[in-house]
Amino acid sequence: DEGKGKAVDFLAERVDYVARFNGGNNAGHTVINNFGTFKIHLVPSGIFAQNTTGLIGGGVVIDPQVLLEEIEMLNKAGIGVDGRLWVSPRSHIIMPYHKILDGLYEEAKGAGATGTTRRGIGPVFADKVSYNGIRWTDFTSDMFEQRLQVQLTLKNKIIVALGGEALKYEEIRDTYRGYYSRLKPYIRELFSIVQDGLKEGRNFLLEQ
């Protein structure tokens, strides 16, 4: 623990925007303040400064369940993130098969296992660079269903070959459509926010 969360929480009082620009929920920040003690993995820890807007950029891979849990926790604690937290529609999404493959790959390596958190971070980044990922932009049409069907066909072959159980399309489709419905109010193009902010001389803090 290097104290990054504490440092960001301190600096956030002096900036207008705090942005997460890469990584995922495999690591997190612990912030202790007047609201309590919080462990957050996706929402920028600068969100605790009431005049600061949090941005989650396209370089961040998102587990939607984790993000929703953090938003709910912060709102219940009186932080009030609605209207102050925006997620890039270009951010890639961690799917159930990413987590399963993360674990199966580790088991297959035996003594040479990497020691990952098994949260799907590596597999989702692999899909991103190989143009196999799913992003929030896909949910605005039936592109999500199309991409999910293709990816699930591919991923189930690997999962079964490594001794796992094939995943069901309908269950994943319905669950993730539900996630999108709940997160849609937070999904917004960030380019204009950043460009306008820079033109206006606003201060940005980049959080890793």
Kindly give the residue locations of the regions a language model identified.
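Non-transmembrane, aqueous-exposed alpha-helical and coiled segments at domain scale
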Residues: 1-207
